[in-house]
Amino acid sequence: MKKKILFLGVGGIGVSALAIAAKKLGADVAGYDSIPNKLTIKLESLGISIFSSPNNVDVSGYDMVVYSSAILDNHPLLSKARVLGVQCLKRAMFLALLMKDFRYSIAVTGTHGKTTTSSILATLLCKLDTTNSFVVGGVVKYADSNIQINGTDRLVIEADESDASFLYLNPNVAIVTNIDLDHMSTYKNSYDNLLENFANFLMKESIENIYLCVDDHGCNDLLDKYRSRVVGNIVSYGFAINSDARIYNYRVSDNLTTFTVEYKSGKYDFELQLPGKYNVQNATACVVACLDLGFSYKDIYNALATVKGVARRFDVYDKQISSHKIPVIDDYGHHPVEVTSSLGAVRDRYPNKKIIHVFQPHRYTRNRDLLIDWPKALSLADQLIILPTYSAGEQIIQGAESQDLIRNIPKVLLADSFDHVLYFLEKLVDDNTVVLIQGAGDITNLVGMIGE
């Protein structure tokens, strides 16, 4: 990749990964972001020039400009690049171009769990074969990075459905974790349109194998409607008895999850450090894909047992609140399905503990679109503490604020700040408590405010 490339919005997790990948593959790379952060500092340490003011950037000196979804069409650097005739690509369009440098690519998509699943697969493949690489949407704990380029053999990528940008990609293998109602403005608020876009992605001629979780209603709806039009070989996985790769013997003990997968003529036992049935589903997609790639069961078993997942997905910390030493869990979940799955995993791992759930809703549009689903999900803990909604740049929508999500939930407290949450926790926590701190906004900062 012998090009001079400018990445706009390079402080984001997705674009920063592409900038590093491009540099590793031989491109001359620079980046722009108006707000420096840990990622831009990391990029500078790798020899990538970072600009924080448009006035300091000469766009005419670049062959290509790659931009994130956070960069508006009227951004001065993007506008000038277009006037000058510089090739301008959205992040996913550049990812599609990057994939062509690799012999084989595996894309993981789905409404929930795609970052965790792609991180599990990335860890497995990099442990099974040191020539494998990945570019995903979260920090993979195995590598302490969202990107690792070890050559140009196999590449694991996370394919984003939120803006339908996965349609730009042409992988050899696709994993679909689930299909659910989220980011529905992308799909004209139509479930049929959502299914059709997933189907169009899976109909790519490049795709040889497709792994779909048939425990999920959306994946089943897709199969019912589009199976005959999909060219690739479809492998269903899940707890459902009719799965091609069937999960059973699910057990949780202390910090270990064990399960068995029956696939083709074999029965395979596995150990996993990650909690919850949803992570067993995620892991099953990965191990079955690895079996189909020709890796041995023994090597896959050993690699999976070491997988620690991705940052901010059920990260457990030992914390002290008042005089009580308790587990505090930091989690990125921000959709009713994710909240339900996470709380189920907390119950599995800590069956005899009182669960306090601290939740920060994310986006007023999500609150509004899923208003009917929130009360059931948020009522599953023993005590809920809810924060104001993290807007992510959206305007307030009347009837879709935090207090509107908790109707008829008996044990709920409204906190107006992180300090207010800490006050509540001091009053509520005892030795038999576990705290789940959850959301996609800045709520992760609350974890650091709690004493070790």
From Swiss-Prot:
Main location, first listed in the record: cytoplasm
Protein name as annotated: UDP-N-acetylmuramate--L-alanine ligase
Key words, A-Z: ATP-binding, Cell cycle, Cell division, Cell shape, Cell wall biogenesis/degradation, Cytoplasm, Ligase, Nucleotide-binding, Peptidoglycan synthesis
Pathway entry: Cell wall biogenesis; peptidoglycan biosynthesis
Record organism: Francisella philomiragia subsp. philomiragia (strain ATCC 25017 / CCUG 19701 / FSC 153 / O#319-036)
HAMAP family to which the protein is assigned, alphabetical: MurC (MF_00046)
InterPro entries the UniProt entry points to: Mur-like_cat_sf (IPR036565), Mur_ligase_C (IPR004101), Mur_ligase_C_dom_sf (IPR036615), Mur_ligase_cen (IPR013221), Mur_ligase_N (IPR000713), MurCDEF_pg_biosynth (IPR050061), UDP-N-AcMur_Ala_ligase_MurC (IPR005758)
Record's subcellular location: Cytoplasm
Reactions catalysed: UDP-N-acetyl-alpha-D-muramate + L-alanine + ATP = UDP-N-acetyl-alpha-D-muramoyl-L-alanine + ADP + phosphate + H(+)
Protein role: Cell wall formation.
GO biological process: cell division; cell wall organization; peptidoglycan biosynthetic process; regulation of cell shape
Residue sites binding ATP per the record: 110-116
Gene: murC
Its EC number(s): 6.3.2.8
GO MF annotation: an example: ATP binding
